[in-house]
Regions:
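N-terminal auxiliary interaction/assembly segments of multi-subunit proteins
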Residues: 1-158
């Protein structure tokens, strides 16, 4: 996978964390992940299709998910299994991926990427495999805790 595919997702994540959640963000380096990804405990997955196929992971630990959900809703939560925490994570993933895909489509006329609905998985150490697809990650350090952005893309015909 070309490492430049992750850039719009990182830019969108940094912007949303700063503007919407009022969190300071420091971005790490892009790293090749290969075909396996291990969850920190709370993972939002959003696929995309069109001229390219792929998926976006927004991954964080449970405490980070609780902090972010509280920032979004103004409520406090005791477990990341609460429905509002799951919905907040899904919505945050939707906003970030929507901004990233809009940026990609605007810079690649005719690509016409579209998003799938988000899914949220919980459980520390879950390993997810990309069949015949490698991915790249960037670790963001936020005031709420570390958040990993992971993107896998297979380019097709425009």
């Amino acid at each position: 996978m070309a490492t430049n595919h992750i850039v719009p997702f990182v830019k969108a994540s940094v912007s949303i964390f700063r503007d919407m959640l009022d969190l300071e963000v420091r971005s790490g380096e892009t790293e090749e992940e290969g075909d396996a990804f291990v969850s920190r405990g709370f993972t939002v997955i959003i696929g995309f299709t069109g001229g390219w196929k792929g998926r976006f992971f927004l991954d964080m630990g449970g405490e980070t998910a609780l902090h972010i959900a509280s920032s979004l809703t103004g409520e406090s939560y005791s477990t990341f299994a609460e429905e509002e925490v799951l919905l907040s994570g899904a919505e945050l993933g939707n906003i970030i991926s929507g901004n990233a895909i809009t940026d990609i489509n605007n810079n690649n006329p005719g690509l016409n990427l579209r998003l799938t609905p988000p899914s949220v998985f919980t459980g520390e150490g879950l390993t997810m495999f990309n069949v015949r697809l490698s991915s790249c990650s960037v670790l963001l350090q936020t005031d709420a805790g570390p958040v990993k952005i992971n993107v896998a893309v297979e380019e097709g015909n425009k």
